[in-house]
């Protein structure tokens, strides 16, 4: 069963609709007992880094989530700020992240004389894989995904980076370390490429 983590933030129904269309057994989960029944977990996130971390802590499931991911090696997909909190820390706030992906979340910083670039980045952008990875298989060449963000992860270990995009310069937009996956873009809003990526994760 694929659990869509409900800790007060994130676009849960969109993921549920995609998984339903793909005929994967899924459930929106919010309790420790529900989490323990999951074979895979999707962790959406919308808002600021600190507010999302606070929601996760207040939900009372951070410890059981860590046990499932770090000790039992359950696959997890963090999306948008759900990916950012996989990192150790963020320029956006003072809270520590989960630290499962070593790195720091940074804000876009580029020449604002290019008026075509705004912060946040809102809209479609091309994603380029940096290595072969199961999460990104069977996508069209140079696939486009939907982004809505002002921050991105700068990974300490470049081996964790599986895809980049360009917005005033290259930035990490997808990561993977062992059973831990993350996308800065929103696959649930990205039509056929997003559906293919969610299918890849659900099929791990």
Curated annotation (Swiss-Prot):
GO cellular component, one term: cytoplasm
Catalytic activity: 5-[(5-phospho-1-deoxy-D-ribulos-1-ylimino)methylamino]-1-(5-phospho-beta-D-ribosyl)imidazole-4-carboxamide + L-glutamine = D-erythro-1-(imidazol-4-yl)glycerol 3-phosphate + 5-amino-1-(5-phospho-beta-D-ribosyl)imidazole-4-carboxamide + L-glutamate + H(+); L-glutamine + H2O = L-glutamate + NH4(+)
GO molecular function: glutaminase activity; imidazoleglycerol-phosphate synthase activity; lyase activity
Protein's pathway: Amino-acid biosynthesis; L-histidine biosynthesis; L-histidine from 5-phospho-alpha-D-ribose 1-diphosphate: step 5/9
Biological process terms in GO annotation: L-histidine biosynthetic process
CDD domains the record matches: GATase1_IGP_Synthase
Main localization (coarse): cytoplasm
Keywords attached to this entry: Amino-acid biosynthesis, Cytoplasm, Glutamine amidotransferase, Histidine biosynthesis, Hydrolase, Lyase
Domain Glutamine amidotransferase type-1 stretches: 1-204
Active-site residues per Swiss-Prot or TrEMBL entry: 80 (nucleophile), 186, 188
Record keyword Lyase present: yes
Its EC number(s): 4.3.2.10, 3.5.1.2
SUPFAM superfamilies per record: Class I glutamine amidotransferase-like
Subcellular location field: Cytoplasm
Function: IGPS catalyzes the conversion of PRFAR and glutamine to IGP, AICAR and glutamate. The HisH subunit catalyzes the hydrolysis of glutamine to glutamate and ammonia as part of the synthesis of IGP and AICAR. The resulting ammonia molecule is channeled to the active site of HisF.
Subunit structure and binding partners: Heterodimer of HisH and HisF.
Name this protein carries in UniProt: Imidazole glycerol phosphate synthase subunit HisH
Species, as recorded: Leptospira borgpetersenii
